[in-house]
């Protein structure tokens, strides 16, 4: 997967911005048994064949498993909850992987581009193109445009200028406040923190 490949990269003298996403224990302050809730919305031009628009709730539950902490992600659209396989040994928030894979899938469906090629461009951008800006008292916003300098921009339509944004705050449950991808009016997707309990 995209996130695991990036996290396994070689050590650098200075920590890359991507460490805030992939090498930070986002869920360290979420106790076993607690739940963190997010909203998930996707809107796209029907002509792109990305799939139906999404307006769902996501619940992230932390538990102690046999091999340590594990996280269960439940997607709930229209009262039909669906659990993903538990995430084990992931240092960051597993919703990051869910979001990145959803984004790659959307670009693939809209453009016909190879998912392997698209994942590699996303991984490259996460490694080399993230920019940082402050958000609120202690938060950070990381932004990238993964296809900004891509040799195949002409084949990507509105996705050539797609902007991906991550908002991280150390005092927020799960640390990820929001993740979004936007390609003009053709496509937008966002996962946003709602609450925890």
Sequence positions of predicted segments:
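Acidic/charged, solvent-exposed loop-and-adjacent secondary-structure segments enriched in E/D, K/R, S/T
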Residues: 85-108
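Bacterial N-terminal signal peptides
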Residues: 1-7
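Acidic, serine/threonine-rich low-complexity disordered tracts
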Residues: 13-87, 108-197
């Amino acid at each position: 997967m995209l996130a695991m490949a990036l996290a396994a990269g070689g050590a650098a003298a200075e920590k890359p911005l991507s460490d805030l996403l992939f090498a930070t224990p986002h869920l360290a302050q979420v106790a076993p048994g607690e739940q963190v809730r997010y909203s998930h919305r996707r809107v796209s031009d029907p002509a792109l064949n990305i799939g139906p628009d999404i307006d769902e709730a996501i619940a992230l539950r932390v538990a102690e498993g046999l091999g340590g902490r594990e996280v269960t992600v439940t997607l709930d659209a229209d009262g039909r909850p669906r659990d993903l396989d538990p995430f084990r040994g992931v240092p960051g928030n597993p919703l990051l992987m869910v979001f990145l894979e959803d984004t790659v899938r959307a670009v693939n469906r809209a453009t016909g581009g190879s998912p392997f090629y698209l994942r590699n461009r996303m991984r490259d951008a996460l490694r080399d193109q993230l920019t940082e800006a402050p958000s609120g008292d202690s938060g950070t916003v990381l932004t990238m445009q993964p296809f900004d300098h891509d040799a195949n921009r002409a084949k990507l339509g509105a996705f050539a200028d797609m902007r991906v944004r991550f908002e991280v705050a150390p005092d927020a449950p799960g640390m990820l406040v929001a993740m979004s991808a936007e390609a003009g009016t053709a496509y937008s997707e966002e996962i946003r923190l709602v609450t925890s309990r």
